[in-house]
Amino acid sequence: MTTIIAFIFVFGLIVFFHELGHFLFAKRAGIMVKDFSIGFGPKIFAYRKKETQYTIRLLPIGGYVRMAGEDGEEIELKPGYRVGLELTPEETVSKIIVNGKDQYVNAQPIEVSLCDLEKELFIEGYEDYDDTKKVRYQVERDALVIDGKIETMITPYDRSFNAKSLGNRAMTIFAGPLFNFILAILIFTALAFVQGGVPSTDNTLGNVLPDGAAAEAGLKKGDEVLSINGKETKSWTDIVQNVSENPGKTLDFKIERDGKTQDIDVKPATQKENGKDVGKIGVETPMDSSFTAKITNGFTQTWNWIVQIFTILGNMFTGGFSLDMLNGPVGIYTSTQQVVQYGFMTVLNWTAVLSINLGIVNLLPLPALDGGRLMFFLYELVRGKPIDPKKEGIIHFAGFALLMVLMILVTWNDIQRAFF
């Protein structure tokens, strides 16, 4: 049960931040957001505020922000349509009832002759279906079209995705992965404050364990290690490497303590790691507890992970691709099951790493991903005009289909690794 809760928390938080990025930048650009959904499948919770419906759905493995004009939907009232109009006191249209007119007793019946619900925002027709009573009404920018139980807000063209500048459209799409990186930065920064600092690369000693070789030799926390066996040590990595390579051998530590230099002999204990003898002296990594180190940790950790993930991706394509290199939801669930055993802080760290992964994967220039859409914007920038929407739609559909096939293969591979 703990794993399930952790899995929902991890995926939910990552997806929420990703979609929040799209949502906030869409709002900033003046784009109408029709749906903000976390998860897929049947609705568990739904809430409408103004033009946007917010939903939480059963399967917490994704989400979406549906922006006006993005999927090519269009409300069209052809000449001859008979509809009902609810009017404001100013004689402007607030509701257009296509079906279910009997539930709106005050609706004005009209047979449509001409209608524009995108640019000029008007509806023209014959009142009471009488061709001698031609009328024309302005339509409110937030007017609703009622089709039975379905209510759809009209989309003035200037509120649609495609009406916005190339820069605004690109930033709205890029904001999803960007917010994944922001989430990672926030988590890594918070962890640095909670844990009291961040691992330091200095050549000083951290906590000295009471029963270790360092304690027996007289080393103390804060000692600066100048050299080991005459070999200069400039960083914590140098200390670890020298100790690890000399199990059971006495080492001459030249240290500085309270401004004075002294030599201390230390004999590392021998431990097995991956079938190999390594030296250990019982000293923890030094911690930098300065405010600057804590506040910058989020940025440095996130950047280091981005570099590492891109390196892995590069190796995948240059060294041969295998499905075993990928994890789907089942694989991530299995990994989360292992991470949970180490406590909440480790789960948070895992969340940050996954968020960076999702951000990078979404930026890959593949159809149906944010990176694929950004490539189309680059094409538009170079060419001076966008690609035909129908052609772009076909490419995205094909890309989505291929991604679904890959997801099925990866999930099946995850199941085999987990249960067989």
UniProtKB/Swiss-Prot annotation:
The keyword Nucleotidyltransferase does not apply. Keywords: Cell membrane, Hydrolase, Membrane, Metal-binding, Metalloprotease, Protease, Transmembrane, Transmembrane helix, Zinc. It comes from Listeria monocytogenes serovar 1/2a (strain ATCC BAA-679 / EGD-e). CDD domains: cpPDZ_EcRseP-like (cd23081), S2P-M50_PDZ_RseP-like (cd06163). This is Putative zinc metalloprotease Lmo1318. Its cofactor is Zn(2+). GO terms for cellular component: plasma membrane. Its EC number is 3.4.24.-. The keyword Membrane applies.
